[in-house]
Amino acid sequence: MRTATIKRKTKETDIEVTVNLDGTGVSNIATGIGFFDHMLDLLARHSRIDLTVKAVGDLHIDHHHTTEDTGIALGQAVKQALGTMAGITRYAGVHMPMDETLSRVVIDISGRPVLVFKVDFPRDKIGEFDTELVREWFQAFAMNASVTLHVETLYGDNSHHIAESCFKGLARALRAAVAIDPKAAGEIPSTKGSLGG
């Protein structure tokens, strides 16, 4: 099974993330940030990646460090669990509706970290959660998972729906991209024979 656990401790946060890429979408999330927990639960459920996240952060300041550092740790865990990436599908893209909102998420598990994020939120906050932190999380995840990730909201009016369509879109794209391709026969999905660089 493709699993990994990452522990990350700084003066600002103490985080432990465990993933099982071949799971069923079971999640156990506790970051102290209700909306963020909801997004990570959606990510696990719709990617079918088992996900445990335990995070303690400096929430008396704001949600920034906890959100970003969780993205770092989760990205590192996914990268570690993928190992050599032999046999994976590698590429995937989805259009994800959430009521009036439609977002497009496309991923390449390339070993080359890139984020293109074209998402606008009509409000600065979703509850107590700063909407600018959605991009911070995606940036941290993409850089540390070493994936090329394009996220774009084509239209939408509700900030909650926009964020949810982005996380669900990533979930479904990840689900497809990390899947083992039975036609690949364990090969690295690159003409170079390796991924990254």
Swiss-Prot record:
Keywords: Amino-acid biosynthesis, Cytoplasm, Histidine biosynthesis, Lyase. One of its GO terms (biological process) is L-histidine biosynthetic process. CDD domains: IGPD (cd07914). It is found in: Cytoplasm. Its main location: cytoplasm. The keyword Kinase does not apply. One of its GO terms (cellular component) is cytoplasm. The keyword RNA-binding does not apply. Its EC number is 4.2.1.19. Pathway: Amino-acid biosynthesis; L-histidine biosynthesis; L-histidine from 5-phospho-alpha-D-ribose 1-diphosphate: step 6/9. One of its GO terms (molecular function) is imidazoleglycerol-phosphate dehydratase activity. It is an enzyme of class 4 (lyase). SUPFAM superfamilies: Ribosomal protein S5 domain 2-like (SSF54211). It holds the Pfam family IGPD. It catalyses: D-erythro-1-(imidazol-4-yl)glycerol 3-phosphate = 3-(imidazol-4-yl)-2-oxopropyl phosphate + H2O. Disulfide bonds: none annotated. Belongs to the imidazoleglycerol-phosphate dehydratase family. This is Imidazoleglycerol-phosphate dehydratase. The gene is hisB.
